[in-house]
Design a protein with these regions (language model features):
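Alpha-helical solenoid repeat scaffolds of the TPR/TPR-like class and their adjacent stem/linker regions
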Residues: 1-423, 439-442, 490, 519
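Rossmann-like AdoMet/SAM-dependent catalytic core
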Residues: 180, 229, 559-664
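Conserved SAM-binding loop of SAM-dependent methyltransferases across substrates and taxa
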Residues: 434-447
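Conserved SAM-binding strand-loop segment of SAM-dependent methyltransferases
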Residues: 471-483
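A short acidic, Gly/Pro-enriched loop at the edge of an enzyme's catalytic core
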Residues: 485-495
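A short SAM/SAH-binding and catalytic strip from SAM-dependent methyltransferases
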Residues: 493-507, 530
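A short glycine-rich, Lys/Arg-flanked "PGG" loop and its adjoining helix->strand segment in the class I
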Residues: 508-520
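Conserved class I S-adenosyl-L-methionine
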Residues: 523-572
Length: 664
């Protein structure tokens, strides 16, 4: 090649192909070596600088990546993707204004760059500008209809919005989010979707008036109209509805259908409505209150179906579905014999096949020692009766991350950074329930191996079924009491126990066992009930004790109905909780057999006794409110300041204190 100028020299096409191949296949060491070689020989070759910046970012060398990315932009200021990449690095460094400027420049240069629109939406969300964020994500989705990250970001953002106007254009995107992928837990999305649906003309005219259908004609008209509202149907299939107006409607419709079942024609619209209602009631674990008259009619319906099966006659689909909206089909010994559900694949699969799968899984779960502690035995019994919680879909990260990336994202204040050098962490989830927690953890940390334990075999079977369904292979389940976990003879890099220790007889005894299992400088994620946030719940628990309310499903539902009908403020406050709307979550909320509550000064003492250092709370919204409360630069790791804040804002930790700590 004739040398005209250094600027015109180019690396070979083979070098560029290899560079791209190394990066795309995760061979970052090779990619770094080759990109460094190219940039040294051809210092003005912008593509090599761009790849080098991406490689350095992947390796966690973010500051070096910034310098290289700026060089890439300098060499070609018209490269929209280079500006977008620079914005990503700025965002990771917390330089949000500069990140926003980079994304906007990328969009200016290339308006159809979907990634830049999505990234801009993330910045808008960080600034609390949720409507603008959602608009950016929608633009990204319109440009790239299969853009998984944009759907996930849209779902995460919109769950915080409460709508004041109708917006039918959002329906297809929301339906996609509910039906495709595991972007966000549907139960977290439900309040936002319901607030949107309340402004839909169909809902306004049909559902939210004082009197619902009182006769067959009105009921058929409503069912026919609602068949057009596919978003509502998709929602009720996958989660409880945390809204008493919608609950009242479905309770009344269910009762009306049961009372007039023989008079309803099995139209496609009717079967569709009844199918989704049965899925909904199964998912909320039959939390809806039923009157004595309904109980009698259900008993008659059970007998009718049983007699038909005994005569080798097949019951109509509408009768099976009506029963399924009140009772669990898999508990009937005739459930495998019915043919009426053969064409209703999802109903048959979820209401019969999946529970049978779980029964088989129970026999396969390893058991670590006997559960002999009396309180642990009672807690286990509760969760065997009501595995917590029942769920269909889950919110999973689009990509697993290194410990260093997670520490940065959570803004953890570490005593030792050596934990960030662990590439393939061993993780323990102590108290995994039905698998949402353990599956989320196994999907969050790259190259991790997770051991998940729980007291309840029913919960573990549910968790294992969902884990297999999702194709997750780095997760093992074990029945065990936390008090017996020292028998594992294993140490862990990370231990997570959220919503568990406060249900033990002696929480510190369990916490000490977990601390002993944690490697030096290991991380622990803990969730504990707040004394201040649960004052009203504590009052209701006292009422339950004084009134000697039982813990049967009928007793629990009857007491729940009394809360709905009560005018007491602290009763009404409970009805605003999403935990109010399914049986296992409601039972866990106020009927739990064992509950301790903590204050932040108590937690500080516990951490000191255990040799753990507080590294930070998890909830970014609470942290933001904490900063606003003090109106100045403030130490977000000072538990004394947090206690002062909570005393002034007692409902801040209404869920739990969820925080990270590190073993000293």
């Amino acid at each position: 090649m004739k040398k005209i100028s250094d600027n015109l020299l180019e690396p070979s096409q083979q070098q560029l192909n290899n560079l791209l191949k190394y990066y795309q296949t995760g061979r970052y060491i090779d990619a770094e070596k080759l990109s460094l070689s190219i940039t040294q020989e051809f210092p003005n070759h912008q593509f090599a600088w761009k790849v080098l910046a991406a490689v350095l970012k992947q390796k966690g060398r973010i500051n070096e990546s910034l310098i290289v990315s700026q060089k890439s932009v300098q060499l070609d200021p018209h490269d929209a993707k280079a500006h977008n990449n620079l914005g990503i690095i700025m965002k990771e460094l917390g330089r949000l204004e500069e990140a926003e400027a980079s994304y906007r420049q990328a969009i200016k240069l290339k308006p159809d760059l979907a990634q830049a629109h999505s990234n801009l939406g993330v910045i808008m969300r960080e600034h609390g500008r949720l409507e603008e964020a959602c608009s950016a994500f929608i633009q990204a989705i319109n440009l790239k209809p299969d853009f998984t990250d944009a759907y996930a970001n849209f779902a995460i953002s919109i769950k915080k919005i409460r709508f004041t106007l109708s917006n039918i254009k959002l329906y297809p995107i929301l339906i996609h989010v509910l039906n495709t992928g595991n972007y966000v837990r549907p139960s977290e999305l439900a309040p936002s979707i319901l607030s949107l649906l309340k402004h839909d003309p169909l809902i306004k005219n049909l559902l939210l008036k004082e009197n619902f259908a009182t006769n067959l004609k009105e009921a058929n008209s409503i069912i026919s109209s609602l068949d057009k509202l596919t978003l509502l149907h998709h929602l009720i299939r996958v989660c409880p509805l945390p809204d008493l107006q919608f609950e009242k409607f479905f309770v009344n419709m269910r009762s009306l259908i049961l009372t007039n079942l023989d008079n309803f024609e099995s139209t496609p619209e009717f079967i569709h409505f009844l199918s989704n209602l049965s899925l909904h009631c199964f998912t909320n674990e039959y939390i809806y209150f039923e009157k004595d008259e309904e109980t009698k009619l259900i008993k008659n319906l059970e007998n009718e179906i049983t007699q038909s099966i005994a005569k080798s006659e097949q019951p109509e689909a509408k009768k099976i579905l009506c029963l399924a909206s009140y009772r669990q089909l898999y508990q009937y010994n005739w459930c495998k014999k019915i043919e009426a559900l053969d064409n209703l694949i999802e109903v048959k699969f979820r209401l019969i096949e999946e529970p049978y799968t779980e029964k088989a899984i129970v026999t396969e779960i390893p058991i670590l020692g006997e559960i002999s502690d009396s309180v642990s035995s009672k807690v286990r019994e509760q969760y065997e009766e009501n595995p917590y919680p029942r769920w269909v879909q889950i919110g999973l990260p689009s990509k697993a991350k290194l410990i260093s990336e997670i520490c940065a994202a959570e803004n953890l204040h570490l005593n030792s950074k050596s934990i960030q050098n662990v590439i393939a962490p061993d993780i323990l989830v102590a108290g995994c329930g039905t698998g949402q927690h353990s599956i989320g953890t196994a999907s969050t940390f790259s190259d991790c191996k997770v051991t998940a334990v729980d007291l309840s075999l029913a919960s573990l079977a549910y968790a294992k079924r969902k884990t297999t369904e999702l194709g997750i292979t780095n997760l093992e389940y074990l029945q065990a009491d936390i008090l017996k976990l020292n028998q594992l003879k294993q140490k862990f890099d990370i231990i997570e126990s959220v919503g568990v220790l406060h249900h033990m007889d002696k929480p510190m005894a369990g916490w000490r066992v977990l601390t002993d299992l944690l490697k030096p400088n290991g991380l622990m994620r803990i969730g504990l009930y707040s004394e201040l946030a649960r004052l009203q719940i504590a009052e209701v628990r006292k009422e339950i004790t004084l009134r000697k309310v039982g813990t049967s499903e009928a007793d629990i539902k009857k007491f729940r109905q009394s809360l709905i009908e009560s005018y007491k403020e602290y009763h009404q406050l409970l009805t605003k909780s999403t935990d109010f709307f399914s049986l296992s979550t409601f039972r866990d909320l106020i009927f739990h057999v064992q509950e301790h509550r903590f204050t932040l000064p108590q937690i500080k003492k516990c951490l000191n006794k255990l040799g753990l250092k507080f590294c930070g709370f998890e909830n970014k919204d609470i942290i933001s409110n904490f900063r606003k409360f003090y109106r100045k630069e403030v130490d977000i790791y000072d538990l004394a300041l947090w206690h002062q804040y909570e005393e002034n804002n007692p409902r801040s930790f209404g869920g739990m204190y969820v925080f990270w700590c590190q073993k000293l």
